[in-house]
């Protein structure tokens, strides 16, 4: 079975695993009448179910913590989360491999092997989901953005990994823990502007002459819990601890827009299928045949991908021609 590789990207604690869990949980809720099915393999299902339980128990206390247990392990021990994609009631015809990894691989003390592991992910993966800790970006005028999100380090990684690209890539900036900043159109607009400013060097890199034709970049804020908002920052030994609170005592788990990264991913894949150049792009050469053989699957993917948001904090930063399917 053909596969598409996607990696999460971000330092420890920003919300990579939380984001992946929310994407998994909400797909079924948002698929609606679309004839698509996303089926995790047994191990992926078991792990993500455990993470989902953790995510929902954040609401057991009125003051919630910031996230769930992150990923741990050495490079050779890590596994990707594997989902089969196809029509409902049929065997999947494409595998989506989502790679998660410990954010500690970005730490100064990380071994060369761990650093190389992350670089290889960026080189090999079709799409990258950059999890952004929104409170660190937004609060106290972004005081903790560099400390938590490490934007310069992320930029340096792409400088190396995206040299001499021979095929298109999709980069998704995904602010998480962002419930507070999506309460109004004005605050959502400010969140988007802060993403542009906080990652300006990386966006400028993507906008360079060599990368502009090959990199599509979008912003998709994901409310991974939906019913908690940022409350305050406590500091201990100069280390920030972000605190959150439920919007009410009886608030329940209610994630919002967590399927949007997947919509953009499938839109990107569909465009590559349509593009006649894809036969010369090695990692995508199979796409024309994959969807070409199954009209109904193509229609289902197209329907799901058509609902990508582009306002109220969402934006297509560049690469419209890599995402335009009509």
Would you name each region that the model predicts?
Residues 289-325:
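Acidic, Ser/Thr-rich low-complexity intrinsically disordered segments
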Residues 67-129, 137-143, 156:
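Switch II of P-loop NTPase G domains
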Residues 5-13, 89-92, 108-122, 144-151, ...:
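Short, charged/polar micro-motifs that form catalytic or ligand-binding hotspots
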Residues 13, 88-90, 103, 178-179, ...:
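Conserved beta-strand elements of beta-rich interaction domains across eukaryotes
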Residues 124-303:
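Conserved GTP-binding G-domain of TRAFAC-class P-loop NTPases and closely related GTPase folds
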Residues 24, 325-326:
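An interfacial alpha-helical scaffold signature
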Residues 1-98:
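Conserved G1/Walker A P-loop phosphate-binding module
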């Amino acid at each position: 079975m053909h596969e598409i590789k996607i990696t999460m990207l971000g330092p420890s604690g920003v919300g990579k695993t939380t984001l992946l869990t929310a994407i998994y949980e909400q797909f079924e809720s948002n698929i609606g009448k679309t004839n698509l099915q996303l089926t995790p393999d047994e191990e992926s299902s078991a792990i993500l179910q455990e993470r989902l339980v953790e995510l929902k128990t954040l609401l057991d206390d009125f003051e919630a913590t910031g996230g769930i247990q992150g990923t741990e392990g050495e490079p050779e021990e890590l596994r990707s989360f594997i989902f089969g994609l196809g029509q409902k009631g049929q065997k999947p015809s494409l595998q989506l491999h989502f790679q998660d990894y410990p954010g500690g691989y970005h730490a100064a003390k990380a071994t060369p092997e761990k650093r190389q592991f992350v670089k290889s992910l960026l080189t090999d993966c079709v799409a990258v989901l950059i999890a952004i800790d929104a409170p660190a970006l937004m609060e106290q005028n972004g005081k903790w953005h560099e400390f938590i999100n490490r934007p310069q380090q992320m930029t340096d990684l792409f400088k190396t990994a995206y040299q001499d690209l021979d095929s298109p890539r999709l980069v998704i900036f995904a602010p998480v823990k962002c419930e507070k900043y999506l309460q109004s159109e004005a605050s959502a607009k400010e969140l988007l502007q802060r993403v542009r400013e906080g990652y300006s060097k990386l966006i400028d890199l993507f906008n360079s002459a060599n990368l502009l034709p090959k990199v599509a970049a979008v912003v998709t804020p994901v409310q991974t819990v939906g019913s908690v908002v940022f409350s305050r920052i406590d500091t201990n030994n100069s280390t920030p601890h972000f605190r959150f609170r439920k919007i009410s005592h009886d608030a329940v788990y209610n994630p919002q827009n967590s399927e949007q990264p997947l919509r953009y991913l499938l839109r990107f894949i569909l465009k590559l299928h349509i593009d006649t150049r894809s036969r010369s792009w090695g990692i995508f050469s199979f796409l024309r045949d994959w969807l070409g053989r199954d009209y109904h699957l193509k229609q289902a993917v197209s329907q799901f991908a058509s609902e990508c948001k582009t306002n109220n904090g969402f934006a297509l930063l560049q690469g419209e021609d890599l995402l335009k399917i009509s």
